[in-house]
Every structure is written in structure tokens, then in C-alpha cells.
Amino acid sequence: MSVSELYFIKILFLSIVQGVSEFIPVSSSGLLVIFENILQLKNNNLLINVTMHGGSLAAVVLFFFKDLINLWNNHKLLSNLIVATLPVVLVGGLLQYLGIIDQIMNIAVIGYATIFFGLLLFFSDKNKEEKFFTKSISHKDSFIIGLYQVLALIPGTSRSGITLTGARFLKFNRVDAAKFSFLLSIPTLSAAFVLGTYEIYKLEETSFNTLSLFAFLFSFLFSLATIKYFLIFLKKFSLNVFVIFRIFLGIILLTFYYTTH
């Protein structure tokens, strides 16, 4: 197998990891750190990163296409999504401008955050009372979930995980909480895709190629499958399996960090 073929396989594997981990309550950044080291691949390819996120964005838009079309008639859901999105836009924009996010992007932070927010997910999922978004959600609830989403700016938190945590603490049922979390991912994924595309445009010499097309396709397919089957999973099971996974993942990351520093 040639070097280029091996690189192709590695990128496709990372695309699968991106597609799956984007929509379940695990640390996608933690998983990528592990697999990038196992595969001896530091994925600093901006084009690949953008197309992978583009694949996840296309998947969630397709899955919730009817809901998105009906947003103009469902003013309550639209306004709640806007309210929940504003905190992360404002805080994230400020932190990005100050360069703080890049400063805290390291394996130790990812490891500790993976464990801590995994435990927080565990306690939030203990709520027995379950409310439904369509009947009970208020702008106050949406704003609180939006504040939880701000914590996703900490590497290792998991955006889907922390919004699920916030919704479960507010006693919303798992499936509705997940759907709201997925809809909330659209603005953040869109922002990442647009900003990334702009950076690619500024580079000028970067052009889309076969590898980026496959990265998009694999991320899209696995994102779509993950959304569908995760919602089915939540109808029958608790989030404990993801809590356990996060704790083990965090331990692996911290062990790797402290044995190499």
C-alpha cells in the first residue's frame, strides 16, 4: 500500500469518527486526539476539516428538513433556537477574538473535561420527571440550555453532550432534548463551515479534490446514521453507557498526557 493510499484511508477513518462523535454525548476532540496519535496523523488539513464538518451539517439539515421548513410557521421553536444560540455566538466570538480557545486546546484539558462533563451528564439523566419541548419549553429554558452550550467551548466537553445535560437538568425527556440539541448544532456547524470555507478561499491555492469529497461523503453518511439510531437508542436506554465511555476516554487521555510530559 502506497503512502498516499494509507493517508486516504486514515482521512476517511477520521471522517467516520467525526460523523459519529458529532451527535452523541462523547468528546469528539478527545477521540480525534487518540486516533490521530494511533494513526500517526495530525489532521491539520483545513480543507478536510471543513468538508468533514460540512458533511455533518448536511446530514442534520437533511434529517430535520421538514422541521426547518416549518420553522417559519413554528415561531415558538424558531425563537427558542435563536435564544439558545445567542450565548455561544457572543461568548465564542469574544473568546476566539482574544485567542483564548487556542490556548486551552491541549490533551490535559480535554481529558479532565471529558470526565467532569461525563459525570455531570450522569447526574442530569437521573431526573425521573419528563417534560416535552413542544408543550413546556420557554425562552428561559432555552437561554439556560444556551448557557450550557457555552461550556462546549471548553475542549473535551461535547456540544451535544452538554446541551443534553442542560435539557435533562431541566427535566425534559431524552428524545426531545436530543432533537433540540441536534437543531442547535445547525448554527454552530454552519458557522464553522462558512468561516472555514472563507479561510480556504483566502489561501487561493487550495482546491477541492477527491479526498475532500470522500471525507464529506463519509462524514455525511455516518452523521445521518448516528442521528437516526441515537434517537432510537434514547427511547429505550439511559445515557449511562456514554458516561462510562467518557470516563474511560478521559483516563486514557490523561494517562497519555502525563506519561509524555
Residue ranges with predicted function:
Residues 1-261:
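Multi-pass membrane proteins that catalyze or facilitate reactions on polyprenyl-/lipid-phosphate substrates
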